[in-house]
């Protein structure tokens, strides 16, 4: 079967757009081909900085002929209805239609439409120009004289050529001929812009790849990544160094070169006085280079970095490395200035005394000065939630309140909360916002803060995603919870909640962070009381907001537990709208899951569900159910045994739950298994004596109540 090769060659495409653009091209073209009646065996996309390529294998040469029947109105229908049918069917008159008869509906018009299949080349030639014109680039441009005309072509960078060939392996492929804004498709591409810029005539994908490789273009982005990583590791090792690997940077750099050549540059060792994170970010952000570290020396960096060139220079890349080194030195000079400036006094100390007094700050300490300035400048956190200074005060109060619960020193928790946002006013964080927290920790240690306070300044942002670590130091935990809970309660109070896929303030991430901290650090916390104290300063906070926010946490907990492998039905069975201790919910789910894995658990579940089903049916029929169980009405020993077992199990399970020993509660309930089985085997619930029936139904309600202390068994599958 024929194969299709398509290449769209342009000026350099931004690296961050390449992967998605290639995927979009594949989806748009394959969807269009299928919609047009073609099928294919496989499709794969490729990309380099200057081209998007699609290789589609086993594409059918022609779409199938289609015979379509369009049913029309009755032959006695009004003229207007008949004319509408003719327009829809593309017929000029009723003479072109057929008349069908139906015993019930009578005679009616039918149009038989035959659509002959189309050649794949024709379909491709029609599809590709439309895809190019409607391509979903985040940003695009117009160029050249034609750009002044309405409707002129837009592309991410000027489009230079389109290659499009089609045909089976056994025949010479043909060029699929079409034109888009003066660019006519062909079988010509071009090699590397500098190393092999000449024309290349292409037949099909295999020789396309090999000819590009000969012309210094590695088409496969994953292979470019492998080349860069392997060569960078080897170059570092040859110089007694280890490469500091960075997957995000590797992805970006592979999108900057068509022919990767790895080189090494260096800078003065004096710059190693700058924190490693700052050096790494400076070199990464500005020069797209990798840093290295001496072999076997921990986290300390070396003064050498690795860059990726797009050309093979005659001097072996010495001038390229030297030029990059000059730029890196200039950037590191700026970073060193930021680093030293942040450790000095601010010029406006005299204006910061009121803020310092408010927060108990020591203006002899650089980080305290930055916090005082953050408050003094009235930096807005959110228009409806006040300034950063007001937010810090809320976090401090909440951290102090949470400290005893999480085992933290309230004084240290308050101090950490006050300094947590101070580094937002530092020069380094102003240049590299992603270092907020990490730089605060370094500055805190430099000014002699308690290690737990310094750690909390960095870790209060944690966890920032499902793969990020959860803080364990009690002071960090107190401030992390306070920060996230203040944010959530505040945005709920002003009614700015996540909707659908929109979550501009990352509230889902904040809630998941609270869930992970409470569950993974095994912290018991009544969220409702924290919501009340955190929301006391908001006019819009109240019982409705508390219920809604608690439901939001339940949703996040369900997502988290399902990702951990928990059964969704067990989670639903345990959670109630009032459940505000997330760790307790998790413990209940764990205990319930273990219990239901046993034979006693499975049988009790079956018996409990049977009792619940009988009760539901009788309650629906409004059958009388006694309010209490009357032992005097028992006729069978199985009734007496079940009643005694329920009384004991209910009492023991209740005591175990009070002690939060959910495994013991399940053990107590397991004693119901045999009495419940015996009851259903030997007792007819719907006795003819209505009083006896009502009493037996009341006994079933006791089973439901006893098990309901742990979970709603009716929600459990099985």
From Swiss-Prot:
Corresponding gene?
A: glyS
- Please write the reaction equations for the catalytic activity of this protein: tRNA(Gly) + glycine + ATP = glycyl-tRNA(Gly) + AMP + diphosphate
Name of the top EC class for this enzyme: ligase
Classification via PANTHER family = GLYCINE--TRNA LIGASE, CHLOROPLASTIC_MITOCHONDRIAL 2, GLYCYL-TRNA SYNTHETASE
Keyword Transcription recorded: no
Q: Which InterPro entries match?
A: DALR_anticod-bd, Gly-tRNA-synth_bsu, Gly-tRNA-synth_heterodimer
Q: Which domain of life is it from?
A: Bacteria
A Pfam family for this UniProt protein?
Answer: DALR_1
Q: Does the keyword RNA-binding apply?
A: no
Stated name of the protein: Glycine--tRNA ligase beta subunit
Q: What does the sequence similarity comment in the record state about its family?
A: Belongs to the class-II aminoacyl-tRNA synthetase family.
Q: Which GO terms describe its biological process?
A: arginyl-tRNA aminoacylation; glycyl-tRNA aminoacylation
Q: Where in the cell is it found?
A: Cytoplasm
Annotated Gene Ontology cellular components are: cytosol
Under Enzyme Commission nomenclature, its number is 6.1.1.14
MF terms (GO), sorted A to Z: arginine-tRNA ligase activity; ATP binding; glycine-tRNA ligase activity
Assembly and oligomerization: Tetramer of two alpha and two beta subunits.
Q: Which UniProt keywords apply?
A: Aminoacyl-tRNA synthetase, ATP-binding, Cytoplasm, Ligase, Nucleotide-binding, Protein biosynthesis
Principal location listed in the UniProt entry: cytoplasm
């Amino acid at each position: 079967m024929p194969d299709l090769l398509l290449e769209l060659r342009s000026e350099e495409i931004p690296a961050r757009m390449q992967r998605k653009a290639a995927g979009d091209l594949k989806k748009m073209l394959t969807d269009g081909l299928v919609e047009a009646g073609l099928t294919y065996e496989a499709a794969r996309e490729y990309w380099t900085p200057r081209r998007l390529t699609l290789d589609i294998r086993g594409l059918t040469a022609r779409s199938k002929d289609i015979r379509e029947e369009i049913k029309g109105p009755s032959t006695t229908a009004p003229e207007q209805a008949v004319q509408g049918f003719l327009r829809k069917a593309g017929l000029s008159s009723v003479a072109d239609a057929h008349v069908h008869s139906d015993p019930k509906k009578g005679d009616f018009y039918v149009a038989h439409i035959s659509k002959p299949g189309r050649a794949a080349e024709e379909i491709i030639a029609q599809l590709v120009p439309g895809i190019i014109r409607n391509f979903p680039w985040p940003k695009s441009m117009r160029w050249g004289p034609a750009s002044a005309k309405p409707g002129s072509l837009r592309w991410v960078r000027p489009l230079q050529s389109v290659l499009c060939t089609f045909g089976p392996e056994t025949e010479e492929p043909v060029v699929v001929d079409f034109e888009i804004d003066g660019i006519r498709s062909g079988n010509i591409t071009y090699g590397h812009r500098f190393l092999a810029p000449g024309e290349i005539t292409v037949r099909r994908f295999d020789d396309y790849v090999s000819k590009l490789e000969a012309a210094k273009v590695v088409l496969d982005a994953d292979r470019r990544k492998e080349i860069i990583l392997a060569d960078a590791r080897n170059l570092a090792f040859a110089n007694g160094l280890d490469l500091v690997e960075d997957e995000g940077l590797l992805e970006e750099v592979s999108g900057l070169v068509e022919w990767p050549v790895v080189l090494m540059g260096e800078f003065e060792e004096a710059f190693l006085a700058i924190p490693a994170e700052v050096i790494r970010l400076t070199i990464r952000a500005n020069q797209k280079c990798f840093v290295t570290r001496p072999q076997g020396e921990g986290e300390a960096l070396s003064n050498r970095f690795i860059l990726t060139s797009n050309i093979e220079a005659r001097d072996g890349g010495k001038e390229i490395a030297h030029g990059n080194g000059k730029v890196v030195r200039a950037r590191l000079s700026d970073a060193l200035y930021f680093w030293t400036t942040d450790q000095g006094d601010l010029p406006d100390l005299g204006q910061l005394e009121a803020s310092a007094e408010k927060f108990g700050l020591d203006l002899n300490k650089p980080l305290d000065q930055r916090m005082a300035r953050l408050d003094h400048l009235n930096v807005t956190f959110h228009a409806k939630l006040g300034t950063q200074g007001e937010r810090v005060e809320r976090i401090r109060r909440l951290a102090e309140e949470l400290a005893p619960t999480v085992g933290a020193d309230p004084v240290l928790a308050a101090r950490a909360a006050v300094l947590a946002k101070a580094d937002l006013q530092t020069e380094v964080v102003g240049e590299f916002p992603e270092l907020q927290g990490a730089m605060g920790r370094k500055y805190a240690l430099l000014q002699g803060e308690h290690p737990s306070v310094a750690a909390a300044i960095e870790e209060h942002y944690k966890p920032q995603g499902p793969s990020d670590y959860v803080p364990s130091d009690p002071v960090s935990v107190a401030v992390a919870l306070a920060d996230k809970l203040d944010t959530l309660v505040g945005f709920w109070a002003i009614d700015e909640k996540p909707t659908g896929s929109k979550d501009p303030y990352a509230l889902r991430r904040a809630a998941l962070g609270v869930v992970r901290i409470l569950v993974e650090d095994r912290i018991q916390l009544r969220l409702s009381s924290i919501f009340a104290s955190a929301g006391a300063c908001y006019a819009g906070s109240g019982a409705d907001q508390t219920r809604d926010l608690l439901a939001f946490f339940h949703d996040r907990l369900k997502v988290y537990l399902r990702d951990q492998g928990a059964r969704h039905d067990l989670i639903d069975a345990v959670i109630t709208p009032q459940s505000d201790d997330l760790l307790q919910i998790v413990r209940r789910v764990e205990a319930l899951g273990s219990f239901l894995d046993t034979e006693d658990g499975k049988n009790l579940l079956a018996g409990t569900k049977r009792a619940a089903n009988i009760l539901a049916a009788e309650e629906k029929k409004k059958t009388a159910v006694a309010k209490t169980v009357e032992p005097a009405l028992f006729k069978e020993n199985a009734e007496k045994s079940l009643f005694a077992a329920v009384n004991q199990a209910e009492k023991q399970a209740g005591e175990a739950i009070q002690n939060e020993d959910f495994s013991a509660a399940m053990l107590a309930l397991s004693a119901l298994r045999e009495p419940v089985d015996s009851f259903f085997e030997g007792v007819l619930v719907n006795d003819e004596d209505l009083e006896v029936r009502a009493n037996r139904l009341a006994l079933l309600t006791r089973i439901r109540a006893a098990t309901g202390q742990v979970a709603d068994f009716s929600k459990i599958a099985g």
